[in-house]
């Protein structure tokens, strides 16, 4: 659920920092000293996918206070919980706050793969001092997205022999310039 990732309230940063502390201890000891609903969801995942697009950078704060920092922390929590993490359809940057930029580099470099949707961003990341060895450029998949009802999805799952009760689960963070209110 989106509210476990970012809920547009004053607790978002506090909750994320608590989760970062829990995940950091886990990465050093292998023991989970506490948990949260977000951590429980991450632990269920076989693969953690960040689908932030332009929201992976300063644009994120246009939709909510500390939105980018909270997103970075949530990504890092998944990494520290030893989940393979992938950024899909990214368009990262810019990073005007030097402290957040330093943390963004750490998170970026710990993605298993960054599947970028255009090459220009890679050049900007290199200018910003990012290690882009995990970056691959692809075409933007946005044109493939269209809404579908459960009735439309069921035959696809059957045809592809996908049993939602037996197959591995993948968690997505879906986010973008699709908000219902300005400034979008």
Positions of PLM-derived features:
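Active-site anion-handling motifs in enzyme catalytic cores
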Residues: 1-184
